[in-house]
Amino acid sequence: MKLIQISSKHYKFLYDLLSERKQFENISHKKLPSYNNHIKFIKSKPYSKWLLIECKEKIIGSVYLSKNNEIAIWIKKGIKDYKMKIRKKVLEEIITKFTRKRYFANINPRNKKIINFYKKNGFKLFYSTFQLEGKKDENLKSDDKRKIEFYKKNGYRIAQHVYMFEKNL
């Protein structure tokens, strides 16, 4: 397994990889952007590091490290990542090559497989964000139970809930 730089010849692969995601895996968008908008996004260099994952001379996924030290690893659906071994190697390589004081992973709480992966690799849950849709949006912490219940009773619905995990080095 090795990590390689992204070039324009990889745009289609990255778009296809994004297209594979199920709704519960996403936290950044509610619907798939157009191909052209995705190319603009890639060209904007939104992350500190954004690399492709190559295994046995085949590109199988991507990984990024954001400017806020957030890590996200995406592997194509057809690839059997037995017991998360590829994902673990990628995580270890990112942490080794791009040393930071701490790292984060933002995960949709319904994505149990990935939550368990990060927990097994030393990440700890330290923050939850709730997004409410209704008359107004407000970020709530998971311990704001009374506020959450108040909003639910008054016509709001939880549109998104994100767990943030961190790993300190």
Where are these regions (language model features)?
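Conserved acetyl-CoA-binding loop-helix of GNAT-fold acetyltransferases
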Residues: 80-97, 112-120, 145, 149, ...
